[in-house]
A protein has these predicted regions:
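A broadly used, surface-exposed interaction patch
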Residues: 33-70, 76
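Internal, well-folded beta-alpha domain core
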Residues: 69-252
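A short linear-motif detector with a strong N-terminal bias
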Residues: 2-6, 56-61, 166-167
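N-terminal ordered "arm"
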Residues: 1-39
Length: 252
């Protein structure tokens, strides 16, 4: 959910009249939504009257609904957002959250919002205490591709298919686990244009630019926040002395 989290931070920044400069996503829990098909979990859109139109039925059986190519879940997470302004009102942010949505989903509950100075990132993370930070692991993908002498797509699919023992043996890292793929953004497939029928206009624009795009998928790792904070204080191991590298930043 990194891209969704970044867009959520972008939304909050616009509402606050400032800019976001990075996010840290801490995963706590997830409940996948879907159904069972032939004994296997299917993360398809749940069927309901609100999702049904004449085009939603199977082309082969006019009485059968086709599965929708979407997946959804309930999420519990913590989000650390770096804003360019140091004057952020927790009260104003609370009011914004009450009327906001995350990735199109309803925000059912959130805890007290706290603000910290830029040099207090460790304090902010210690307040969260537990969970799993999301790390960029494109280094694993590059190393796997180079050692196997295969193309990037082959390396991507093979790396994700490795079991934990094989993964740790290949990279000689006994702590390596919880590798996954996620959407990191989008790349345009064509030039932007506002000359297209059916474009949903932005709230503050008469003409909104539009372009078809493809997702950019990357390798990430879920890593224990508690372990990061523990290593942060170890003098002999400087891997996590700089907590700023947990920040995900985006470019347009």
């Amino acid at each position: 959910p990194l891209f969704a989290a970044n867009m959520f931070a972008h939304h909050l920044a616009r509402q606050l009249g400032t800019q976001e400069e990075g996010i840290i996503y801490i995963h706590h829990d997830q409940q996948r939504l879907g159904g069972q098909a032939y004994g296997r979990f299917t993360p398809a859109q749940r069927r309901g009257a609100v999702f049904i139109g004449k085009k939603d039925y199977s082309s082969k059986n006019k009485y059968a609904l086709s599965l929708q190519p979407t997946a959804s879940c309930h999420l519990e997470f913590s989000l650390v957002i770096k804003f360019s302004s140091s004057r952020i009102s927790p009260e104003k942010l609370t009011n914004i959250l009450k009327r906001s949505r995350f990735a199109g989903g309803q925000i059912i509950e959130f805890l007290e919002i706290t603000t910290h100075a830029e040099n207090e990132l460790e304090t902010a993370l210690k307040k969260i205490k537990t969970g799993f930070a999301i790390l960029d692991r494109q280094d694993l993908l590059i190393e796997y591709q180079q050692r196997k002498q295969i193309n990037r797509v082959q390396a991507f699919t093979q790396l994700l298919a490795l079991k934990t023992d094989a993964l740790r043996a290949f990279f000689n890292d006994q702590n390596l686990s919880w590798i996954s793929a996620t959407n990191l953004g989008y790349a345009l497939l064509e030039p932007l244009t506002d000359q297209r029928a059916g474009i949903r206009q932005a709230q503050d624009q008469e003409n909104t630019a539009h372009a078809y795009a493809e997702p950019l998928t990357g390798i990430i790792q879920y890593f224990s926040l508690g372990e990061i904070l523990r290593r942060n204080t170890e003098a002999e191991d400087d891997t996590w002395h700089n907590l700023q590298k947990l920040l995900w930043t985006y470019h347009w």
